[in-house]
């Protein structure tokens, strides 16, 4: 069995996330805990929480299969102390909501220096923000997503991820989500089997495969090392199905959520079926 699904819409309520995932035949799913483009601190009603937990049990989804995504507005490395505090508070709010929903993972983007501080300074601020969040919450693993290196985003290389983890105090509550499109766009070679082997060997050597807690399985509309984050459906971009096949067969050595964020959601069911056939 594989934990494979998609990032589905929560429009209409959190319960719809589960229904939509079940309709896809998914054994994993991702969703936004709240509107990803608003700063609102969300407090779920008790009935919403109870219904979500009930439906997860009814349809046999456990927390290891669910990889919720944090708000796009959160920047844990923000150069402004005022905006950094705002990001930290929203991040903690999302972690608390994960715990209330019986979820054990939260996927997030590390942050951006906005060309106002150095990458190293930004990495330190991200690690400090993670430590702040861990100190003020319990029970949820924080899963850092690698980035494409677009704009001033950090986290586009394994060295960045390793530096952040090195400064995190509760290492049992930190993990990594590798996005295949982001790997490709940031310069890692996923086009050939040899390239895939070398890329994941480098990840193991620099970060450690034991930190891998999820993956986003996407093709890319842009060429390798473009530093442009544009997802594509599997086999329709510059990565190709053969590389995705190798990753699915060789990297998912332990069960963790593999989430599609491909552009045409009408193809999700077929993509899930294809991955499950491997």
Swiss-Prot record:
Catalytic reaction(s) noted: Endonucleolytic cleavage to 5'-phosphooligonucleotide end-products
Top-level EC class as recorded in UniProt: hydrolase
Keyword Nuclease: yes
A biological process from GO: base-excision repair
Residues where Zn(2+) 3 binds: 182, 229, 231
EC number: 3.1.21.2
SUPFAM superfamilies: Xylose isomerase-like
Keyword Transcription regulation included in the entry's annotation: no
Keywords per UniProt: DNA damage, DNA repair, Endonuclease, Hydrolase, Metal-binding, Nuclease, Zinc
Binding residue positions for Zn(2+) 2: 145, 179, 216, 261
UniProt xrefs under InterPro entries: AP_endonuc_2, AP_endonuc_F2_Zn_BS, Xyl_isomerase-like_sf, Xyl_isomerase-like_TIM-brl
Disulfide bridge map: none
Residues the entry annotates as binding Zn(2+) 1: 69, 109, 145
Assigned protein family: Belongs to the AP endonuclease 2 family.
Role of this protein: Endonuclease IV plays a role in DNA repair. It cleaves phosphodiester bonds at apurinic or apyrimidinic (AP) sites, generating a 3'-hydroxyl group and a 5'-terminal sugar phosphate.
Protein name, per record: Probable endonuclease 4
Annotated source species: Buchnera aphidicola subsp. Baizongia pistaciae (strain Bp)
The organism's taxonomic lineage, starting at the top: Bacteria, Pseudomonadati, Pseudomonadota, Gammaproteobacteria, Enterobacterales
GN (gene name): nfo
């Amino acid at each position: 069995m594989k934990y494979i699904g998609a990032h589905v819409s929560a429009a209409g309520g959190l319960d719809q996330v589960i229904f939509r995932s079940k309709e896809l035949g998914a054994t994993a799913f991702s969703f936004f805990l709240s509107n990803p483009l608003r700063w609102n601190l969300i407090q779920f009603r008790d009935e919403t929480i109870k219904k979500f937990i009930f439906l997860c049990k009814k349809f046999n989804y456990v927390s290891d299969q669910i990889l919720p995504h944090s708000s796009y507005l959160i920047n844990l490395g923000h150069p402004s102390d005022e905006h950094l505090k705002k990001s930290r508070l929203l991040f903690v709010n999302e972690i608390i909501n994960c715990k209330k929903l019986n979820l054990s993972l939260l996927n997030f983007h590390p942050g951006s220096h906005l060309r106002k501080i150095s990458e190293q300074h930004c990495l330190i601020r991200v690690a400090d923000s993670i430590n702040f969040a861990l100190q003020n919450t319990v029970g949820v693993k924080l899963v850092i997503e690698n980035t494409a290196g677009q704009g001033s985003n950090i986290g586009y290389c394994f060295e960045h991820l390793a530096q952040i983890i090195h400064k995190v105090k509760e290492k049992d509550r930190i993990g990594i989500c590798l996005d295949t499109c982001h790997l490709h766009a940031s310069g890692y070679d996923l086009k050939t089997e040899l390239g895939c082997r070398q890329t994941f060997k480098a990840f193991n050597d620099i970060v450690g495969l034991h930190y891998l807690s999820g993956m986003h399985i996407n093709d890319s509309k842009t060429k390798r090392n473009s530093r442009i984050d544009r997802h594509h459906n599997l086999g329709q971009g510059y990565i190709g199905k053969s590389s995705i096949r190798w990753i699915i067969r060789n990297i998912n050595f332990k069960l963790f959520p593999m989430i599609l964020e491909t552009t045409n959601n009408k193809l999700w069911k077929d993509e899930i079926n294809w991955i499950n056939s491997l």
